[in-house]
Structure formats: structure tokens, C-alpha cells
Amino acid sequence: MKMRKLFAGIAAAATLLGGMALGAASAQADGAATTAGSGTTVTGSAKFKFTAQDAKQLTNRELNAYKIADYVQYGTGNDATYGVQTAGTVTDQSGIKAALEAAVAGTNKTVPTDGGDLMAWALAEGVLDTTESSKDTATGAWKNGASRKFVETLKTRINMLGDPTVVDLGKNLAKDGLSATVTLPAGLYLFVDADYSAGTNKDATPSIAILVGSGNVENGVLNPLAEATVDIKNQTTAVTKKVNGKDAITASVGQKVTYTITSKVPQNTQYYSDYGYTYTDTPSVGQTVDFDSLKVTVADKALTKDTDYTVAKNEDGTFTVTISSIQKQTAGALITVTYAAKVTEAGASGSKAVTNAVVLSDNGAEATDSTTITNSGFSFTKTDAQGNPLAGATFTIRVPGVDGSFTATSDKTGTVTFKGLADGTYEVNETTVPNGFQQSLKAKFNVIIENGEVKFNGTDVWGLAPKESSDKYQVKNVKNVSQLPLTGAAGTTLFTVVALLVAGAGVAVALKSRQRVH
């Protein structure tokens, strides 16, 4: 009866942990065997296959394998059966005892103190079968069931388990990178990520500790040397950053933009004594961050600054947002960090583009994303009717999203330049005409910027701004109406003005004639 319960407990633990496949007997175990009480210890080797959803989970990944139990064969041939006993490499039984006490806490079981083998008792009594202590059997490896309590407690006492065997998963990858297979002596192992406390592997987070046994059970027969398969219990990290909802935008000087950073609360943070989760943001020159606007939400619920998260400005111009409450948040929930910034760079293109990168450090694993802001401008030349450059002409444009207007004045070469403009259509209005020129005749025209390319869109009503767009676009001032163009819309306007003047003169003469008659 005890033996049947032993294997039932082993099989249940195997189901729970996704890799501990043990059970009833087979006489097919090869390799040498040493005497263990009335049985012999199985010393043959077995393979352990670790699988992952993403190759990064296994890349550069090392695990420390602590053997905590041996298989023991009782009998020979077709009558052979198997049990377990604490591994001879364990140096201090009190570590396993403490782990078992954590596992049975709240149950009617008591860890024996009579000197018997603790691992044999644990599996015989079904201690690692969480169906007796937790209803969460489907995902027990990630939850706080009996087996997980056992593993998490034992992980803190690995100094009592003897020297581990280091297995390098990164050097034993399958061609697709989604599995890694290593060979170890048959038995039950606690696998602890070598990077667990340091958190320096940038490819993926450290794995939580895993309890895995070699072998499998088929038709009630145990083969302790069969390959065991287990999912690595870590995850890759991802982060997304947008500016105004996009990867790249154009924005004018003085325009406010909104940055949004998103990621998800990682799994299994509860199994770490300290879990680091930090965004390091690197805004380039050409923008001013509004730190008062920075907000953090998890699942659309606002977090409290200095309680749930902290913000630190660094001397190199970067700043960090640390989610200090990450272990209290719901796994898989969306984390959103938002803040505003004002664009200050008027020549944001090429090497001067305004960039903003974020690096998410998820307990050592890293992910990064970035955004880009560009802007451009346009120039034209102010001339007189003969094409000579004019200084002192002032023009203004209205810029969406920016208070006030942009103003530019022609220099001694007649050049007028507007910088730091987002893509869009701008109406250019002449507001100041140089002295000596007709003050009532002012130019007005449109400029279209698209993907940084500039197109001038004339002609204005006076013909001062030409219709054709070119790199040498010239806008004129005239001293009198006779210098206005005599063709096109401008010519029509001129003749209309002249006609009105003539008509006005005719009316005046007629009125004077009537006055003489009367």
C-alpha cells in the first residue's frame, strides 16, 4: 500500500511540475547500482530536456543542478520496483526538513523526526501532490502550492545540498533554439538559475527554481533513465515606446509631445525576495521633459509616486522610473508610463534628430525601444521688382500646437528663413514692407512641407509671390502699382484697380459738370 502511494505521489508531483516524470517499476535500468538498504541505488544517466517558447529564454542560460534524491531499485527482472531516497550528496538533512515543513504547513501531516529518510517519506505521503493542499493543480508550478513552497524554501538552503552540477543550456541548444538537452545521473533534482540573484542575463529573466526528476511512467512501469521534459520557468522581456502614438513623427519647435511606454507585469515575481523592474529613459538634446506630467498606471489604475514607483534624474541626462510595487501587481497586467516634453531643436534632422530611447530592466533581462522626432524649414528671397535683394521685410506663420506665431525678417541678402517646422501647410503673410515700397501691397502665399520636402504654393492676389515652386523662390515688393505683373490674376487685379480709378474719375467729372449746369 505504501509503495502504491509512493508512486502516486511521484506521479502527481510530475504532473504538477511539468517535468518530474516518475512512477512504478521497470527492470530495464542500466548502469551500475550500489546497495541502499534492501535495494540498490540506480547510477545510470538520463537526459533532461528544457523547452522554451523563445530561444532567448535558453540563450546564455546556466542552471545549477542539486541532486536531492536517488532512485532505489528493489528486486530484479520483471519483479523490480523503484523507490527514492535522499541523495548521498546532500550534506545537511535539515535543509530538506525545513522545506518539507513549509510544504505541509496548514495540513495534518507532520515531518517525521525518527531519523527515517525524508524524501522517501515525502513522496510516499504525497506531500508534493498539491491536490491535497491546493486546488490549483493545473498551474501549481507557478503558484504557491505545496511543491512550490518546498522548492522556494529549499532554494534558500542550497548550501546544505552539496556541490551542484553546472549545466549550460546555451551550449546544448537544439537547432531551432527552443530546447536544450543535458545529461545527468538519474534522480530527482532542484535546478536553480545560476543568474538567479545577479540578474545579469539580458536575454531573459532568471528562471524560478524547478524540481525535476528523470524517467517516465508508461503502463504502470517506471523507466528511471528515460528523458524528462520540462518548461524553463523564465520569460523574455518586451517594451514599447511611442511618441504621439507613433514610432516617428514631425514636430515644430515649441510643440508639446506625449511619450508612452508600455510593458506587462512579469510572471512569478512573488518567488523572488527582491525583484527589480526599472525603465531607464534617455531623451536626447532638443527637448525638455515635463517631469510633473509623468504618470504610471497598471491595468488603467493610477499608481502613487514614491509609494508604488519612484523617479530619479541622473547626471548624464537620463532618468529612471522604478516600479517598486511590481511584486504586488497582477501578472500580465499592462503597465503604462506617460509623460510630456516640449521640442526645442529647430534643426531636428539627420544627426540632430530628437530621439528618445527606453531600456527596460526586468530583473536583469533587458528590452529597448526608441522614438524619433524630426522637423525642417524653408527659405525664400525677398526682392524688389528688378530682382535686387531687400532687407527688412517681415513675415509670419501660424504653427499648429504652438502658442503665438513664428516671425522671420529678410537679411541683407534678402533671405527669409523659417526653421523647426513639422510637416504641414503654412500660410505665409508679409506683415512689414521695407521703407520706400508700396505699404498696402503685401505678399501672401502657402508653403507645404511633406516628409521634409518643401513646395511653395503661390500666386498671391498681387502676383508678388510666383506660382512656380523652386529652390530660388523669390517674393517681391513694388514701389507702385505699375510694377505689378500685367498677366494672370495679378494683371486682372491691376486692370480692375485702374478701371475703378478711371470710373471714379469719370464720376467726379460728371458731378462737376452737373454742378455748372445748375
Task: Locate predicted features.
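Solvent-exposed loop/turn and edge beta-strand elements of beta-rich ligand-binding domains
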Residues: K2-H518
